């Protein structure tokens, strides 16, 4: 039996789906992280190989019957990383087609259930990716928390901390974030933020979790929080604008989907994003995610079989 394999290689877990050529999912398997940017090459190789061999063992299938394997992972735009990941699969003895793509590409394919369209992702980080009917693709954002990721949870969290400290110093507009952030982090004073930010090994996810505080403050009527969320929505729209213009989609009917806890769970931000989009690109249709990234990898693998 011919089949394809789709793999979503994440920083916290790896998700694989094995499907027939007519998109019937036969099996899915989960393993640990396989992001080459946050795990060692040896660990990524072990996870990917165990994942594939465990799945095939459960199905009783041989690797020779696999028509194509698609792996989507962060940072896979780089040729060097693509080659490293491909070699990991080749070492299993697989001689078929291997497609290594950025994780945004498999998220788009899964979300819309086809390869053409646009996806905006805003969780801890942010990125926009699009592909047109001619097969041209473009991305905007996704440069990481230090130099980019505008409109992400991390971006919102950092802006919230800065606004709170400006309020505390009397050099900025008064905001209830000043006290709400301390309460959320269980800190006694604003001076304690120094230890929290610089010395405690705080993670990007912890900073991004402050989006809940900002959203709560907005609901209470805090104007500073409202501006932070609206600015995040505008930044996400600008990433879409860049992709739309590069791919010449300005006057075309395009399907767009959104992913990530920030854009999908903060209603005001999502509504403002939609307003920006509808005002500038009324032909763009926004839909909810239809399927997950692992299935998106299946779609891409299958499309490369023809």
From Swiss-Prot:
Biological process per Gene Ontology, one example term: N-acetylglucosamine metabolic process
What this protein needs as a cofactor is: Mg(2+)
Task: Tell me the pathway.
Answer: Cell wall biogenesis; peptidoglycan recycling
Q: Which cysteines form disulfides?
A: none
> What reaction does this enzyme carry out catalytically?
N-acetyl-D-glucosamine + ATP = N-acetyl-D-glucosamine 6-phosphate + ADP + H(+); N-acetyl-D-muramate + ATP = N-acetyl-D-muramate 6-phosphate + ADP + H(+)
With respect to pH, the record says: Optimum pH is 7.5 to 9.0. Retains half maximal activity at about pH 6.5 and 10.5 and is inactive at pH 5 and below.
Q: Where in the cell is it found?
A: Cytoplasm
Q: Which residues bind substrate?
A: 35, 142-144, 149
This protein's GO CC annotations: cytoplasm
Q: Which EC main class describes this enzyme?
A: transferase
Instruction: State the family named in the UniProt similarity comment for this chain.
Output: Belongs to the eukaryotic-type N-acetylglucosamine kinase family.
Q: What does this protein do?
A: Catalyzes the ATP-dependent phosphorylation of both cell wall (peptidoglycan) amino sugars, N-acetylmuramic acid (MurNAc) and N-acetylglucosamine (GlcNAc), at the 6-hydroxyl group. Neither the non-N-acetylated forms of the cell wall sugars, i.e., glucosamine and/or muramic acid, nor epimeric hexoses or 1,6-anhydro-MurNAc are substrates for the enzyme. May have a role in the rescue of the murein sugars GlcNAc and MurNAc released from muropeptides during cell wall turnover in C.acetobutylicum.
| Protein name as annotated | N-acetylmuramic acid/N-acetylglucosamine kinase
The organism of origin for this protein: Clostridium acetobutylicum (strain ATCC 824 / DSM 792 / JCM 1419 / IAM 19013 / LMG 5710 / NBRC 13948 / NRRL B-527 / VKM B-1787 / 2291 / W)
Q: What is the lineage of its organism?
A: Bacteria, Bacillati, Bacillota, Clostridia, Eubacteriales
């Amino acid at each position: 039996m011919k089949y394809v394999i789709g793999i979503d290689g994440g920083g916290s877990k790896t998700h694989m789906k094995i499907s027939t050529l007519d998109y019937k999912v036969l099996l899915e398997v989960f393993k640990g992280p396989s992001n080459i940017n946050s795990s060692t090459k040896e660990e990524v190789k072990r996870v990917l190989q165990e994942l594939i061999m465990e799945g095939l063992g459960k199905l009783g299938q041989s690797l020779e019957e696999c028509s194509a394997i698609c792996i989507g992972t962060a940072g896979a735009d780089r040729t060097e990383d693509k080659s490293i990941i491909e070699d990991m699969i080749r070492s299993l003895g697989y001689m078929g087609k291997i497609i290594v793509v950025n994780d945004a590409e498999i998220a788009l394919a899964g979300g819309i259930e086809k390869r053409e369209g646009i996806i905006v992702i805003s969780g801890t980080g942010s990125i926009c990716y699009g592909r047109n009917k001619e097969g041209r693709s473009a991305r905007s954002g996704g440069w990481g928390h230090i130099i980019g990721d505008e409109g992400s949870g991390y971006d919102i969290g950092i802006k919230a901390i800065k606004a709170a400290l400006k309020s505390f110093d009397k050099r900025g507009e008064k905001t209830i974030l000043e006290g709400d952030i301390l309460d959320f982090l269980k800190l006694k004073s604003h001076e304690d933020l120094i230890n929290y930010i610089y010395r405690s090994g705080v993670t990007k996810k912890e900073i991004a979790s402050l989006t809940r505080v900002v959203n709560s403050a907005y609901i209470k009527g805090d104007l500073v929080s409202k501006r932070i969320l609206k600015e995040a929505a505008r930044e996400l729209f600008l990433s879409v604008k860049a992709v739309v213009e590069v791919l010449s989609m300005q006057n075309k009917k395009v399907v767009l989907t959104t992913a990530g806890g920030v854009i999908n769970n903060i209603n005001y931000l999502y509504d403002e994003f939609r307003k920006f989009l509808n005002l500038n690109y009324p032909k763009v249709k926004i839909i909810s995610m239809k399927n997950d990234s692992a299935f998106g990898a299946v779609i891409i693998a299958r499309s490369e079989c023809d």
